[in-house]
Structures are given as C-alpha cells and as structure tokens.
Amino acid sequence: MPRTKKVGSAGRFGPRYGLKIRRRVAAVEEKMRQKHTCPVCGRKAVRRISTGIWQCQKCGATFAGGAYLPATPAGRIAKRGISSP
C-alpha cells in the first residue's frame, strides 16, 4: 500500500482529490486503526472487523458501532438517554 510522509495511508490516492481531503482521510483511518476501549471488559483491545463491526481481542465481545469508530456521537447521546431515569 503506497504511503507518503504528508498523508500516510491516503498516499494511495496519489495526486487526486487534493491535499486537504487526503489529510482528512488519513486522520480518520489513523483513528480507526487504533485500539479502542471495550465496553464489556474495559480493556483497550477493540479492533474493527469490518464496516461497523467491532471485536474485543481480549474478551471476544463483538458489537456494532460506527463505521470508523466504535462509538458514534449519536450513539453516546442515545446511551445517555437510556441509562438515565
């Protein structure tokens, strides 16, 4: 996979789409590839399996989340509304 110093993994797009968009894509992909906190066991071991599917490598919990992050802003608001009486 081609990479460049300025845009990392978005270097695969070459000179297309402009630098600003490629930097934004690189930032989103970098966040996506990080390990995230598991909502079940609390460990930082959640990886993306496919679009919207996340799995904890420690406890094996599989759950649906956002396409690029396990918890979306709308999901956090909904969870807050459900948990409070």
UniProtKB/Swiss-Prot annotation:
Origin superkingdom: Archaea
InterPro entries: Ribosomal_eL37/eL43 (IPR011331), Ribosomal_eL43 (IPR002674), Ribosomal_protein_eL43 (IPR050522), Ribosomal_zn-bd (IPR011332)
A single BP term in Gene Ontology: translation
Cofactor list: Zn(2+)
Chain positions of all zinc fingers (C4-type): 38-59
Keyword terms, alphabetized: Metal-binding, Ribonucleoprotein, Ribosomal protein, RNA-binding, Zinc, Zinc-finger
Keyword Transferase on entry: no
GO terms of molecular function: large ribosomal subunit rRNA binding; structural constituent of ribosome; zinc ion binding
A cellular component term, taken from the record's GO annotations: ribosome
Metal-binding keyword on record: yes
PANTHER family cross-referenced by the UniProt entry: 60S RIBOSOMAL PROTEIN L37A, LARGE RIBOSOMAL SUBUNIT PROTEIN EL43
Family the entry assigns: Belongs to the eukaryotic ribosomal protein eL43 family.
Protein name from the UniProt record: Large ribosomal subunit protein eL43
